[in-house]
């Protein structure tokens, strides 16, 4: 009897503990075909792994998970196997006990509405809403790009140019918003993406503005993992090439003999 009571109490305690760490994501969308597969990815830095899948029926989908040890899950919702969707995702932040509702009226998933009590989500939503019209236009181009995979290079190049133009406008709006907001983890994530443009896009026009935003961070933020990644993008180390002049210096071997680099 005691063993049965102990087992029951242990099971009850486990269920209570699990419930305290659970969060749910409930979706209600229109304009999406029944049978559309929805994938939920858990993000760790720039790497994502599939943690759940559901099929949209009558415009609904549902996920239930336990939050990770740090208490905040960064998730990505995608419908990549459907050509009606852009090659983009919906970013979701989840914490224990959060009841998250996702709504949409079309297949433009990146701008579906996420109603959530999680503060990181609320802050992230501000960036999306600030450029909602541009993001929708960008997604429509992304969907069109799927149908042009076999089109002539000139046509695909023209489409990419339109995407780049819209992306630049989004960056401009985001930087203006970032000037008004306090520095936070979400803020730094946006700065990281801007720093990637500085590093890899030779046509990116806002390097000085990005550097000014970087200088808003305090030392603790600059020395964080994200802060260091931003710095590497903005201030890449100089690579010495063959033929470049090097500063000479004296080096001593174990026998005390002097050697020079040049």
Model feature map: region roles:
Residues 19-165, 169-172:
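A non-transmembrane, solvent-exposed segment enriched in polar/low-complexity residues
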Residues 160-162, 198-207:
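Short coil/turn connectors between adjacent alpha-helices in alpha-solenoid helical repeat scaffolds
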Residues 205-216, 244-249:
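Alpha-helical repeat scaffolds
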